[in-house]
From Swiss-Prot:
<protein>
    <recommendedName>
        <fullName>Small ribosomal subunit protein bS18</fullName>
    </recommendedName>
</protein>
<keyword id="KW-0689">Ribosomal protein</keyword>
<dbReference type="GO" id="GO:0003735">
    <property type="term" value="F:structural constituent of ribosome"/>
</dbReference>
<keyword id="KW-0687">Ribonucleoprotein</keyword>
<dbReference type="InterPro" id="IPR001648">
    <property type="entry name" value="Ribosomal_bS18"/>
</dbReference>
<dbReference type="GO" id="GO:0006412">
    <property type="term" value="P:translation"/>
</dbReference>
<keyword id="KW-0694">RNA-binding</keyword>
<comment type="similarity">
    <text>Belongs to the bacterial ribosomal protein bS18 family.</text>
</comment>
<dbReference type="InterPro" id="IPR018275">
    <property type="entry name" value="Ribosomal_bS18_CS"/>
</dbReference>
<keyword id="KW-0699">rRNA-binding</keyword>
<dbReference type="GO" id="GO:0022627">
    <property type="term" value="C:cytosolic small ribosomal subunit"/>
</dbReference>
<dbReference type="GO" id="GO:0070181">
    <property type="term" value="F:small ribosomal subunit rRNA binding"/>
</dbReference>
<comment type="subunit">
    <text>Part of the 30S ribosomal subunit. Forms a tight heterodimer with protein bS6.</text>
</comment>
<dbReference type="InterPro" id="IPR036870">
    <property type="entry name" value="Ribosomal_bS18_sf"/>
</dbReference>
<dbReference type="Pfam" id="PF01084">
    <property type="entry name" value="Ribosomal_S18"/>
</dbReference>
<comment type="function">
    <text>Binds as a heterodimer with protein bS6 to the central domain of the 16S rRNA, where it helps stabilize the platform of the 30S subunit.</text>
</comment>
Amino acid sequence: MARRGRPKRRKVCFFTANKITHIDYKDVDLLKRFISERGKILPRRVTGTSAKYQRKLTVAIKRARQVALLPYVNDVN
């Protein structure tokens, strides 16, 4: 049984839309938008970021984790 309705709207890259060219690993509030409640990096298909910025985002999140600005894992109880 196929579900009908409106076609899905294409997600827009947050960084392209806001003209952000540099993703700083010290900007924790921005990075938290792209991390799940468990602490995992959200995939492109969920966030809508372009491939270029997803790569930059991944590097920034990993750097922030290494200097203890972000946790590797969030314990949700």
